[in-house]
């Protein structure tokens, strides 16, 4: 009997209710279902007064999940998808994202598509789209103090009521750059429509093999977003006396001290999205973010 995963946002009543329907339909279709909570993919925030420990990003893999899982259905919003990515990517498990949240930018299907979903799943008619993910590591000397996998971005910024930050950033073998700003964002193409977009960064189509560095409120007219190859590792050195906050995928992360450095590199484990139909990125931008909509009504051609 093929094994499949069901990752649910247990904090949302609609997701929990929908999970019961999905589990029954999957079992009736001949699948063994391993149901887990998306909370297992949440990172949490480390205590700034205690020494951080790193269990590696594999620690987010749920109990009962292994490489024999054919696919996992994810029920929730975009935050749930980001958590599920950390739970599945290390094992190479494809995810089918079903929106029970709000915007659903990362959703492939909706609750109104249930019949269509099961028709494709039972017939195993789908394609896989691979999205770049990142490994983010906080290093002190040769020791890794904290590590996580992320799909969208890593944001490193000042705490409230502290002064502007200074960063020295090295991209691959290029000359290091100095940035003075409230923070910096290192994002994937998937993350280019998230925090980076709000900070003035460009939208990047998901198939581009690049990463993006975006300053947050920089104190320079010359400081702008930079796009570069995703084969280039990035090192961020905090050049400021105060501790900084690092947030991964908008949910949680850790504190970074002046003696630490942050390493970011492309992960060997892309996030695999199941596509039931052609995924047209520009149409998603139009529908979800209003990109490319006409500002005036077009004349009737009839």
From Swiss-Prot:
Q: From what superkingdom does this record's organism come? A: Bacteria
Glycoprotein as UniProt keyword = no
Q: Name one GO molecular function term.
A: metal ion binding
**Cellular localisation:** Cytoplasm
Q: What does the entry list under GO cellular component?
A: cytoplasm
Q: Keyword Iron-sulfur, does the record have it?
A: no
> Which reaction is catalysed here?
NAD(+) + ATP = ADP + NADP(+) + H(+)
Output the InterPro entries linked to this UniProt entry.
ATP-NAD_kinase_N, ATP-NAD_kinase_PpnK-typ_C, NAD/diacylglycerol_kinase_sf, NADK
Q: Which cofactor does it need?
A: a divalent metal cation
Q: Where is the active site?
A: 78 (proton acceptor)
Top-level EC class as recorded in UniProt: transferase
- Note the Pfam families from the entry: NAD_kinase, NAD_kinase_C
- Residues reported in the UniProt entry to bind NAD(+): 78-79, 152-153, 182, 193-198
Q: What is its EC number?
A: 2.7.1.23
Summarizing the function annotation, the protein's role is: Involved in the regulation of the intracellular balance of NAD and NADP, and is a key enzyme in the biosynthesis of NADP. Catalyzes specifically the phosphorylation on 2'-hydroxyl of the adenosine moiety of NAD to yield NADP.
HAMAP family in the cross-refs: NAD_kinase
What is the protein name for this chain? Answer: NAD kinase 2
